[in-house]
Swiss-Prot record:
Protein name per UniProt: Translin-1
InterPro entries assigned: Translin (IPR033956), Translin_C (IPR016069), Translin_fam (IPR002848), Translin_N (IPR016068), Translin_sf (IPR036081)
GO molecular function: GU repeat RNA binding; microsatellite binding; single-stranded telomeric DNA binding
Keywords noted in UniProt: Cytoplasm, DNA-binding, Meiosis, Nucleus, RNA-binding
Length: 220
């Protein structure tokens, strides 16, 4: 048997491993910044004093995302997109949350409303519907991010009641209801996305319960 065949295969394996290592290093740097922003946004309705920190973190994440996009665009998208897929979902989710809570430019979207996929791409300066298979924000990443936002809004509904911000649960419920009804028109082919959507009914119920309790106790 000609061993050169396996030597060539090993060379290709080493090459692909090197590419994955480079991409993973960029993703790790991005993830580190995402953790910082997530902490800043965790109770953003109760703490409006960290606006400058949030804006700075958003800009850093934007820069890191564009850096990853530039690097990743040198390689076949569908071969390596699994390296950054979850991290980019989180980028989109945190930008949706920042916008919903009024931490982004309100000329893009008013507070308590949802950025579109195209708007997120415009903010990050990353392609959304590319003609070629290069780095971009995918529809699936956006939909996962929207569902994650709903889970966070349901969680923050409870926290906002504790802190006396009684209007937040109503805004959150309005958004979750709209997302729930909008997802009904989609024919989801992605198994992961279908499972994620299945959990939305629990977020909706949780949010409805908070609003019901507020009304029953005449707090609004």
């Amino acid at each position: 048997m000609n061993k050169s065949i396996f030597i060539q295969l090993q060379d290709q394996i080493d090459k692909e491993h090197s590419i994955r290592e480079k991409l993973t290093a960029e993703v790790d740097l991005l993830d580190e910044k995402l953790r910082v922003l997530q902490l800043l946004l965790a109770n953003c309705e109760q703490n409006l004093e960290n606006q400058e920190e949030i804006l700075e973190a958003l800009e850093i994440i934007k820069s890191k995302t564009r850096g990853l996009a530039e690097l990743a665009s040198n390689f076949p998208y569908y071969k390596y997109n699994g390296v950054w897929d979850r991290s980019i979902q989180k980028v989109v989710y945190l930008y949706l949350l920042a916008s919903w809570t009024g931490r982004l430019d309100k000329s893009l979207r008013p507070t308590y409303s949802l950025l579109s996929l195209s708007e997120v791409g415009q903010i990050l300066q990353v392609p959304v519907f590319p003609e070629e298979s290069t780095f971009h924000l995918s529809i699936e990443q956006y939909l996962h991010a929207v569902l994650s936002l709903c889970s966070e809004l349901a969680r923050q509904s409870v926290n906002s009641v504790i802190s006396g911000n009684y209007h937040i649960p109503f805004e959150a419920l309005n958004t979750i209801q709209k997302v729930h009804s909008s997802f009904q028109v989609l024919s989801l082919k992605n198994d992961s996305l279908r499972r994620h959507f299945d959990g939305l009914k629990y977020d909706l119920k949780r949010s409805e319960d908070v609003v019901y309790d507020l009304r029953i106790h005449k707090l609004v």
